């Protein structure tokens, strides 16, 4: 009888320890999330996303010849409004949709700063679709929560990342950066 009790007690302890280890492993992965990626800045220098640890991040695939390109103004506006509260926008130029980002990195940088006075970080041009999809976008589209996953369908798809590096929400291109929906989501993460 005593041996049966000890075996049961041992089994319970093993289950509890395994459960705790799984929770810790999940937390460790979630804590690293987006921070594990390093891409190049628009100037071609390595720019680790870990530099933004502790900030709320909006990741956006951008293009300079798209019907949604005027969203640069609203992106810059919300960046200016919230940057001192720990918010940053990261723009990733991509030429995957209708060849609407054909320029070089230098041309993209000039366009963004002259036409829209962009001050938030813009990265070097990448691909957001397969077969040459950047690892960051593989993560965003395949390794996040089911409501967030899915192929990028067009320019200016946005991903909101919490202060721990976890992707918490996705906004399709038609959702403007200054919309009530997006502003509320950003403010919720900044609290």
Q: Where are these predicted regions, by residue range?
A:
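Amphipathic alpha-helical repeat scaffolds
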Residues: 41, 61-65
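N-terminal "domain-start" segment that seeds a small globular fold
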Residues: 28-50, 134-135
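Thiol-/selenol-based redox modules, centered on thioredoxin-like
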Residues: 135-138, 142-191
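N-terminal secretory signal peptides that target proteins for export/translocation
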Residues: 1-11
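Bacterial N-terminal signal peptides
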Residues: 13-27
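Structural microenvironment flanking redox-active thiols in thiol-disulfide oxidoreductases
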Residues: 68-133
């Amino acid at each position: 009888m005593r041996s049966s009790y000890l075996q049961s007690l041992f089994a319970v302890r093993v289950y509890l320890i395994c459960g705790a280890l799984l929770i810790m492993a999940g937390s460790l992965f979630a804590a690293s999330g987006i921070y594990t990626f390093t891409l190049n800045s628009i100037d071609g220098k390595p720019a680790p996303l870990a530099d933004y640890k502790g900030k709320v991040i909006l990741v956006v695939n951008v293009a300079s010849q798209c019907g949604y390109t005027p969203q640069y103004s609203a992106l810059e506006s919300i960046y200016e409004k919230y940057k001192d509260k720990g918010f940053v926008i990261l723009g990733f130029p991509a030429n995957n949709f209708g060849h609407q980002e054909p320029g070089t990195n230098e041309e993209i940088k000039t366009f963004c700063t002259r036409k829209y006075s962009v001050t938030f970080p813009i990265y070097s041009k990448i691909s957001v679709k397969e077969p040459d999809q950047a690892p960051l976008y593989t993560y965003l589209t395949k390794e996040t929560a089911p409501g967030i996953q899915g192929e990028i369908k067009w320019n200016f798809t946005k991903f909101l990342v919490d202060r721990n590096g976890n992707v918490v929400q996705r906004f399709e291109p038609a959702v403007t950066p200054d919309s009530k929906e997006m502003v509320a989501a950003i403010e919720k993460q900044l609290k």
